Curated annotation (Swiss-Prot):
It comes from the Eukaryota. 3'-5' DNA helicase and substrate-recognition component of the SCF(FBH1) E3 ubiquitin ligase complex that plays a key role in response to stalled/damaged replication forks. Involved in genome maintenance by acting as an anti-recombinogenic helicase and preventing extensive strand exchange during homologous recombination: promotes RAD51 filament dissolution from stalled forks, thereby inhibiting homologous recombination and preventing excessive recombination. Ubiquitinated. Ubiquitination by the DCX(DTL) complex, also named CRL4(CDT2), leading to its degradation: ubiquitination takes place after its localization to DNA damage sites, possibly to facilitate the translesion synthesis (TLS) pathway. It comes from Mus musculus. It is found in: Nucleus; Chromosome. The lineage of its organism: Eukaryota, Metazoa, Chordata, Craniata, Vertebrata. This is F-box DNA helicase 1.
């Protein structure tokens, strides 16, 4: 065996050098000379043609720059919540917080400088040294010949390594080693407990990379990872890692935050104790100031220098405001013996922040080399503030959810950033053929790592725009040896899925599979009804004396309920409990009517199932009918390893029965908050179906923070969804009225869509428009037919007006327009009701308006100036700018005025209404134009779009009055800060110009946060203004009735 040729130092030598003024551990902090005193201690590069072994590094710095390990196909099975493979877990150790929280540019450039002052990162400086010189032997054997002119930092590193080699050669216990052929020297081993300074035997096993790091370094790395990863993956690696993660002193606030979210009893008790013992209570005006005082008690490293922290924060836009607040309200923390309390200052800046960018800028400043705080300490402080803010809202304290959301958003991006994430090419449903490249999030990677087994039921709870389709595509690609069935409800989505899924996936709709097995038989017999079963059809076949459109509607609804159910027999339980009488009133169905309804529905179903020809439309088989027959036949899909059910929130019990009865694995994917088809009998499979595994997708690729905040707040305030929070990306988005890119006008009803189409096509230069779903599906022909039916018979003959629609034409010889309208009301046909409303509103202008809309409509939406449609048709699509029109559910006024409307309750509206609004909001990518009602919803969470400014700056131009119309207060000179309402433009084109609020009006809106701007005594001394609420006439009548 050849001799291992390395310079060796004894332990005594190492300690001697460490205690010397040369400081071996920090050679670059010494004064540079032509000969570095540590010359010889640096690893030596290879100089001849012999290749290094695979995985070996040349310099010690390469050990810490290990490349990211890509995931292989051999992934471990996940637990009930999923887990990463070992390779992926190790790859995630390499974190760059700058990718998520660092601002793109800073004027002074300090953030990009290393501790040595070089503008180049350390790894780039080492790489520059290797490339800029040719290899040669050291110690006088051969000198290095420069290829180019070296950068100063590269030159210094070269000199440092040469000097270190000479110094080490003097201490070598083996004389003459320096003169031997350097080719015989093997590659540097990986660091051991002495980091290679004592050498390494040839037979010694090379240790793994990260496992040999000291516990202190591991703790620092682990602090940047999500809690889920720490407990589900890293704690299973080895005993050392498990001990670190379970150490109560390791990230205590981060752990406490997540334990509080899941209502762990000890965590809730601990946080409640902190709130009560430190005066952070609902009845205390100073609860926010007490929160800052408690945060100031956070333990930090003794090396924290307040002056250097202040210097690193010098260009933060909230520094002056936070300092002024502490100087006036917390003088003991501002003028502490050791300097200003750093964590109190950080807490004040966080509480005064108005957007995520303020928190990101704070993290950016504290990450500078001039700052002496560590990022784990900063992160722990933010988690401390976050858990206290969350608990304050739970206790009913009037505090904005925006502050907690800002903190959570920044920490989420910091912990879930990945420098080398897997890229996916995804084809959006809006623009077929146009592919965009995205990066798989950590949540998506967890799903990919899970191997499906027979009978498993997996749920993927995905928020809007989180990449459901791309996740399923990558899953199918990863598990390419398995066969999958992708099923959805929409035919166009299934066709687009065929273009993006790999060959091991079959893409179908539920109805297409049922048609191939059952429906085709009825088509061959010409007994297939291509349209929906209507009360008009049913009324024609009801028994004599038992007819009428109200009874026919009851029979239709009974059949619809049976088709949607998983039941095998039609029973009285399928008859609706409520119906509308002839006066349009909602009444309970009597028992006798129920019995009659189930008998007629059973007779109708028996005739529909017969394959013989029939003339009556009511006896023809419908699409939902043959789907029910297929479900009753108990189909077996045995050729697939797993079934992907997309948009699972819209599944009917019949469809769930088909899927759950299969022996293969099942993956239900969808957003439970996009369920908007309950009127069709859909139930939310994501809530009702028991599961073996559940995963979440919470980060949207579609929009940035502002739009994400609006969507998250709708779920928070209106549906009490707080355990999982919707977040977006790090790109810009806006919600205060500006427009960017293509504009979509989204409405709840078709009548409002028609109104907007009329508005945007008016004038000398009408806009190019596109109706979602196409102009034919919008039904302009039926609007013309209804208008024709409205005309007198003489007028129809005179102008040769013809009604094309067969159903509407029947009413010409029956009861005319009035009878048609009564039928639509009794049948509760929402589509025809909207068209009748349009005809009655525009009357004689209908032919002209329809012709104009048809002329301005273009089929290619890429070239349209405006895209119009209902939320139901826009579901699954996305647009640059979204105008939310004013026909959605309404909150009549802001939170501070709701006391004047004691009967208003958010809970009084159905979940479908809030889901419609959520779907509309989350279609936006760059800009969202809100209604006044939508802003009022945000005020329910405490968001009033206020921004703190120094009172001294506000009063530079003289006396400033409060911007609230009925308030007579002025801004006092002796206050510290003043809140400014930011301007906003609503979707009806009205503008709120904003302005400065007096401290009394500010306190009504933001509660105890106002006492950061002025003392409670100053606020109470001001006149309190009660605003008059002016509601639209229709809304006022509704509140009087209910």
């Amino acid at each position: 065996m050849r001799r291992f040729k390395r310079k060796h130092l004894t332990v005594v030598d190492c300690h001697h050098l460490a205690r010397s003024h040369l400081a071996v551990t920090q050679p670059f902090s010494q004064r540079w000379t032509n000969r570095d005193p540590n010359h010889g201690l640096y690893p030596r590069p290879r100089t001849k043609g012999r290749n290094r072994g695979r995985g070996c590094q040349r310099y010690i710095s390469e050990f810490f720059l290990a490349g990211h390990q890509h995931c292989t196909n051999d992934m471990a099975k996940s637990n009930s919540v999923g887990q990463d493979s070992c390779q992926d877990a190790e790859g995630d150790m390499i974190l760059t917080a700058e990718s998520s929280c660092t601002l793109p540019q800073v004027d002074n450039g300090e953030a990009r400088l290393g501790s040595s002052g070089s503008a180049q990162p350390a790894r780039k400086r080492a790489h520059c040294f290797e490339e800029a010189t040719e290899s040669g032997q050291w110690d006088g054997v051969t000198k290095k010949t420069p290829r180019h002119r070296l950068f100063p930092s590269c030159s210094r590193l070269r000199e440092a390594r040469q000097g270190a080699e000479d110094s080490l050669s003097q201490c070598s216990p083996v004389p003459g080693e320096a003169g031997r052929d350097i080719e015989d020297i093997g590659p540097d081993p990986l660091p051991d407990s002495y980091y290679g300074l004592l050498g390494m035997l040839p037979c010694q096993e090379v240790p793994s990379h990260i496992c040999r790091l000291p516990s202190e370094v591991l703790r620092h790395i682990f602090a940047f990872l999500p809690v889920e990863d720490l407990y589900w993956n890293l704690s299973l690696v080895c005993h050392l890692w498990r001990e670190i993660i379970n150490d109560p002193l390791f990230i205590p606030w981060k752990k406490l935050y997540h334990r509080y979210l899941i209502n762990e009893e000890q965590a809730v008790s601990k946080v409640d104790g902190i709130l009560s013992s430190h005066g952070i209570e609902k009845d205390s005006d100073l609860c926010v100031l007490n929160l800052i005082r408690y945060t100031a008690t956070t333990k930090c490293s003794p090396s924290v220098d307040p002056e250097r922290v202040l210097w690193s924060l010098r260009d933060h836009p909230l520094l002056l405001e936070a300092e002024a607040c502490m100087r006036q309200q917390l003088p003991d923390l501002y003028a502490a013996a050791g300097g200003i309390n750093v964590w109190a200052l950080v807490a004040a800046m966080v509480l005064l922040s108005s957007c995520v960018n303020d928190i990101q800028h704070l993290l950016f400043c504290l990450r500078r080399p001039s700052s002496t705080v560590t990022m784990p300490d900063v992160t722990e402080t933010l988690y401390c503030i976050a858990v206290l803010l969350y608990a304050m809202r739970e206790k009913g304290i009037n505090i904005s959810n925006r502050i907690h959301y800002n903190i959570f958003y920044c920490l989420y991006l910091q912990e879930n950033s990945c420098t080398q994430a897997t890229k996916v090419t995804e084809e959006p449903s809006v623009w077929p053929g146009k592919k965009t490249s995205i990066q798989l999030t950590h949540e998506q990677q967890l799903i990919l790592n899970h191997k499906m087994e027979p009978l498993q039921v997996v749920k993927i709870m995905a928020f809007a725009g989180t990449g459901k389709t791309s996740t399923l595509v990558k899953y199918a690609e990863k598990w390419s040896q398995s066969r999958f069935l992708y099923v959805t409800f929409n035919k166009s989505i299934a066709k687009q899925a065929e273009l993006v899924f790999p060959s091991n996936v079959i893409c179908k709709t539920f109805h297409s599979m049922a048609y191939s097995h059952v429906g085709r038989k009825y088509q061959l017999k010409k007994k297939l009804n291509l349209f929906k079963l209507t009360p008009f059809m049913v009324n024609s076949v009801l028994a004599e004396g038992k007819g009428g459109f109200i009874r026919a509607k009851l029979v239709c609804k009974t059949l619809e309920n049976f088709f949607a159910s998983a039941d095998e027999e039609l029973t009285i339980d399928h008859v609706p409990i409520w119906c509308k009488n002839s006066h349009g009133q909602r009444v309970m169905v009597e028992q006798s009517e129920k019995l009659n309804g189930v008998l007629e529905a059973s007779r109708l179903w028996d005739n529909m199932r017969k394959l013989g020809e029939c003339k009556e439309e009511a006896y023809q088989m419908t699409h939902d009918g043959y789907l029910k027959l297929w479900q009753l036949s108990k189909p077996l899909l045995a050729s697939f390893d797993a079934i992907f059910v997309d948009e699972a929130q819209d599944c009917t019990p019949a469809i769930m029965n088909i899927v759950l009865s299969q022996p293969c694995g099942k993956i239900f994917v969808g957003d439970p908050h996009q369920q908007i088809y309950t009127f069709r009998g859909a139930v939310n499979a994501l809530f009702t179906v028991p599961h073996t595994h559940v995963f979440y997708l919470t980060q949207s690729f579609r929009f940035g923070v502002e739009i994400a905040y609006v969507g998250a707040t709708i779920l928070d305030v209106c549906k009490r969804v707080r355990k999982k929070t919707l977040v977006g990306g790090n790109h810009q988005s806006g919600i205060r009225g500006d427009i960017k890119g293509q504009v979509a006008l989204l409405s709840r009803t078709n009548a409002n869509v028609f109104d907007e189409a009329v508005r945007v096509t008016e004038g000398e230069s009408p806009a190019r428009i596109h109706l979602i779903g196409g102009i034919k599906s919008f039904g302009l022909d039926r609007i013309i037919d209804i208008w024709t039916l409205l005309q007198p018979e003489e007028e129809r003959r005179k102008r040769d007006l013809i009604i094309k629609d067969r159903f509407i034409r029947r009413w010409v010889h029956k009861e005319g327009f009035s009878g048609f309208k009564r039928y639509v009301t009794a049948a509760e046909d929402k589509e025809l009701e909207a068209k009748i409303a349009v005809v009655e509103k525009y009357n004689i202008r209908i032919p002209e308006l329809v012709e104009r809309i048809e002329r301005c409509h273009i089929d290619d939406l890429d070239f349209a100036e405006y895209i119009l449609g209902t939320v139901h048709k826009a579901k699954g699509l996305e647009f640059d700018t979204v105008h939310v029109l004013d026909d959605f559910v309404k909150v009549p006024c802001a939170r501070h005025n709701l006391a004047q409307l004691p009967h208003f309750r958010v809970e009084s509206f159905s979940e479908d209404e809030w889901n419609l609004l959520y779907v509309a909001v989350t279609r936006a990518k760059k800009r969202l134009i809100m209604t006044k009602s939508l802003e009022n919803i945000l005020t329910l969470a405490g968001e009033y779009f206020l921004q703190a400014e120094l009172t001294s700056n506000v009063l530079k131009t003289g006396v400033v009055h409060c911007c609230v119309g009925q308030c007579n207060n002025t801004i006092p000179v002796d206050t510290i800060l003043t809140m400014k309402k930011l301007p906003i433009t609503y979707s009806n084109r009205k503008e709120n110009k904003g302005g400065y609020l007096c401290h009394s009006c500010a306190e009504q809106r933001i509660g105890p946060l106002a006492f950061l701007t002025a003392s409670p005594e100053q606020v109470r001394a001001m006149e309190r203004t009660v605003e008059d609420i002016v509601l639209p006439r229709q809304e006022a009548l509704l509140f009087l009735v209910f």
